[in-house]
Curated annotation (Swiss-Prot):
Iron-trafficking protein involved in multiple processes such as apoptosis, innate immunity and renal development. Binds iron through association with 2,3-dihydroxybenzoic acid (2,3-DHBA), a siderophore that shares structural similarities with bacterial enterobactin, and delivers or removes iron from the cell, depending on the context. Iron-bound form (holo-24p3) is internalized following binding to the SLC22A17 (24p3R) receptor, leading to release of iron and subsequent increase of intracellular iron concentration. One of its GO terms (molecular function) is protease binding. This is Neutrophil gelatinase-associated lipocalin. The gene is LCN2. Enterobactin binds at residues 126, 154. Disulfide bonds join 96-195. Belongs to the calycin superfamily. Lipocalin family. It comes from the Eukaryota. PROSITE patterns: LIPOCALIN. One of its GO terms (cellular component) is extracellular exosome. GO terms for biological process: acute-phase response; cellular response to amyloid-beta; cellular response to hydrogen peroxide; cellular response to hypoxia; cellular response to increased oxygen levels; cellular response to interleukin-1; cellular response to interleukin-6; cellular response to lipopolysaccharide.
Amino acid sequence: MPLGLLWLGLALLGALHAQAQDSTSDLIPAPPLSKVPLQQNFQDNQFQGKWYVVGLAGNAILREDKDPQKMYATIYELKEDKSYNVTSVLFRKKKCDYWIRTFVPGCQPGEFTLGNIKSYPGLTSYLVRVVSTNYNQHAMVFFKKVSQNREYFKITLYGRTKELTSELKENFIRFSKSLGLPENHIVFPVPIDQCIDG
């Protein structure tokens, strides 16, 4: 009897271990950077200012019909050293939430890394790439990070206003799908007024 319980315990432990491995490998793999365009002749001074997050897609983003994602805003403030102070303003738990970080210029114009990355436990790399923008209406930005040895990526569709044309949204969907994301990993946050209009 004790031997039978031991085998049962080992079998359950093995099943739990296999399940844990499955849950860490269920992320859609990040695409190679060769599949992610870079905005030519990126103009850092024109990109700064407030952007509304009109669309979001990523391997850790899932559409929630019962509790849809609320729109938030991100402000890029260009500093003298050509890095950006980046502040995202979100409405959470009935109050305004601010997330502040620094994006440091990378190898090419329009590409950035996260400044002071060591202050983010578990984060080993963080890349930002401006895919396309016309500066005064819309932008598409690709983010990739490695956290706790897991690779996450997302694409953000920014608008200078809360509404963008259906053509721009369709283009965003097409691009997200070209990077391997299915429809349920693509969301269009619900426009709100709280916190993001100040």
